[in-house]
Amino acid sequence: MNSCENPIVLTDGDVRFRLDTDAVPGWCDGWMTLSAAGTLPVPDTLPGDRLILPVDEGIALPVDTPVEPGEFALDTLTRARNCREKTLNLFLMVRGGKCLAITTDSGLHTGYALRWADGRYHLTLTSDAPVTVRYRIFGTAAAACRAYRAMRPAAVPLRDKIARTPALAQLIGGAIFWVWNDGYDEVMYADRDTDRVPDTGGAMLDVAADLHANGVDRAMFGLFFDGDSRLAQPLAERFGYLATQYDNYNDVLNPALVGVVPTNRVRNCGYTARRMKDYPAGIARSRSGELASAWALKGFDGQFHAQNALCPAVAAQRMREEIPPILAQYPAYRGRFIDVYGTGVGECFDPRHPLTVDDCLTVKRGAFASLRDMGLIVGTEDGFEELLDDLDYAEGLHSPVVFRNRDSGRNHAHVYTDAQEAHIARYMLHPAYRFPMMELAYHDCILAFPYWGDSTEMSPAQIRRKTLFACLYGCPPLYSFTVGNYPRLRGAILDSYRTISAVHRAVGLMEMTDFGVLTPDCTVQRAVFGDEIEVIVNFGDRAYEADGRRLEPLGLHWGAIRK
């Protein structure tokens, strides 16, 4: 039940959410509505509240407990438009066993900020255009997410995406593998030139052969360096594996930096050489005319030097020009992973290729659709809901960016250090800090993989917890490792694949229809898929018993719901 007082206080039983505003409320389909612009009315948090925010698939924050920074600091989080820190236009505040949902009718123009003050986190919502804000109290956060899905435009389900790109079916119960040469980082991130060839070559086929011989029957291998494109065909012919090629239409190396940074990337990363032709004419510009910056490279001086960001409109044109000849040369490719492009939207003020935020979304959707029209499985980094119809999978969506380790983008084939493992255990793998917002809204529409710098096997001591999260959320695994580390990781990779694959084959095409926490400490959680299959996990160190069922520590139960 939702009721409203004057001044505006939304109540449900003893739970109250106060809105300090003079706006006159309306009601529509059970939601209270307000018209607003600029700073939007949001209740202040109270001690004991939890905020559930759309960072990648979703995070849950006890508002009175500060989070130590990892890749980003939460207390300075400000995201104005749809991006990986705002994948859904939905914000949840949990208080007294109830959940207040807040959304607007224009996600593209709604942003939020999180700040730490007076011993707790505070949430601010803003809009750069007039919007209708909707508020409603639900009994559970899961019910709020499901109601949000019901009020959104219909999304393209994975079943329809498989119908148009049949190879995608291989990822239902499958996995993505990024297998790296032991010296790849000397080429990618060193501050000196090297003659080392970064291609993984035949060693990747050896790993693939071992995986296949041990039951990994569904997989897609990511190929990063151009020299490894020749592996796409034997991966398909020998093992039935898919191959996708890494590509980048964002990071542009200023030719003047050749000689300042090592030439390794120019010589070995085909996309780097292809991007340089668009400097400076194709670079996105700010309102003041400055060139947009992008991923930094280490120079001979040991310092990092920023590249520049290609305008999304120019990027879309380059995809249409460059990818077909590559596919003609390597027809065994079945996918394309476009890094960075799916992480957000922006503007460009260069008069040769101007873009508004709305234009940018249209351009990016068209670019991804063009890959689909080439018959490719379409993937990107993170993604957000307005892109979902044109994407098949997203790497990083299952690894909330604010909980990743610092520099995880540069450490995407390393085994965690003790300090990195401790940070991941504290947040990324802590069940109280995660919540499957994206899965409750769109599980049947997108495949959400981990980030390659937070891959399934990266913490051998924690791989069981990674496996439990994947099963609970119905997400497939992603493995990223060097060939030299494969022998020590092999057993854990195979065990996790077998466990996750079995669950994902059963639930991968279903909606997540319910989700709940079964214990006060959040260690035992339950997800329901299609109102048919339940997955229950115990993240705790004590056995859990209920309804005649016993679940051991780090235990997993899944199957048909008991009637």
Each model region followed by its residue ranges:
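A short acidic, amphipathic alpha-helical/loop segment
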Residues: D206-D210, R230-L235
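Segments forming glycine/polar-rich beta-alpha architectures that bind adenosine-containing cofactors
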Residues: M204-L223, F539
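Substrate-binding/active-site clefts of carbohydrate-active enzymes
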Residues: L242-A315
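Extended, Lys/Arg-enriched charged tracts that mediate electrostatic binding to polyanionic substrates
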Residues: T76-C83, L88-L90, G97-L100
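Active-site-proximal substrate-binding groove within the catalytic cores of carbohydrate-active enzymes
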Residues: D12, D20, V24-G30, S35-A37, ...
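A cross-domain feature marking catalytic cores of carbohydrate-active enzymes
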Residues: V55, L223-F225, Q245-D247, V340, ...
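Short acidic-hydrophobic catalytic motif
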Residues: P166-I172, I176, W180, A203, ...
